[in-house]
Amino acid sequence: MNEKTILVAVTDIFFYTKVRDALMAKGYKIERARTQQDIAEKASSTTLSAFIVDMNDEKLNAFQALETLKADTSMKTIPILAFANHEEVDTFHRAKALGVTKIVSRNEFSSRLKDLVEEVAGTHV
């Protein structure tokens, strides 16, 4: 089996565990990023099928992470699935402007995680 790796930038351990368990059940390998440095190092050293980022994570600067990924030619094609609080319209617009493949509300992310990852990761060869 060709294992697909997904980098997950979520510092909340309970939310991360939910994401990890759901995706590992689908056969994905999960790498966790807890810091900006983690994101840059893991994204550049691993062939990623997708990058998942919590735009509201207070311990990570999600916008900086997106800028870092998109600035590097070897990483700028990685599909990105982002999620944020639904009322933060500016966050949605800014994330899209920075090249996020898909951004959804936290509720939609939680309820449709597997489908969303398949949709986003399926765009990456």
Where are these regions (language model features)?
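Conserved phosphotransfer cores of two-component systems
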Residues: 70-76
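Two-component/phosphorelay signaling modules centered on CheY-like receiver
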Residues: 13-31
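Acidic, metal-coordinating helix/loop segments flanking the phosphotransfer/catalytic sites
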Residues: 35-50
